[in-house]
């Protein structure tokens, strides 16, 4: 302790970021695949430029010294990149179903598709019942097709991890973290944080290539509003408000 007292705060952060510290103190739980079942169709969604096809994934905030960490549920629309994040204590049905109900309602446009990896927190009868009630189709990632849920996984790193970090957060802080998400993080991501949107071009060999240009950057709100006849996609009672 005498030696530690002389170490600067910045160096303590460096030590905590080391591989040795991470291996000794922290453990991250990966999504557990379900056993082979017929729930959900294995295919990549094809929205054809229409919003309403969301990708969803779970982010674990790590275990430390035997204490379980909380989980973030991250849902992203493929076309507009509209993003909704919800934090729960655990990914059991008790917490997941109420969270998913709130998240699905939070999207301003009508939802058509719900795509997940093969995690048991999404591929189960309770989620199917919820989606059927809302007339939303469930699809799941194909075997050995790592790009099927790439959008949600990339947003895990570029938004959830970037803002909330990798450090362990105990489960009992889930309500406070979720309050931060709903009040600050979700509005920031959708109304203030620009995203790259690809433009498809044909190269000299006749192959399609995606280009990410700065002039095509938009916030999810602006991207939604820029769609042809965008009002047709909005849920009943929701309108585009003029922003100052």
Model-derived features with residue positions:
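Secondary-structure boundary/capping micro-motif
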Residues: 1-113, 118-146, 150-244
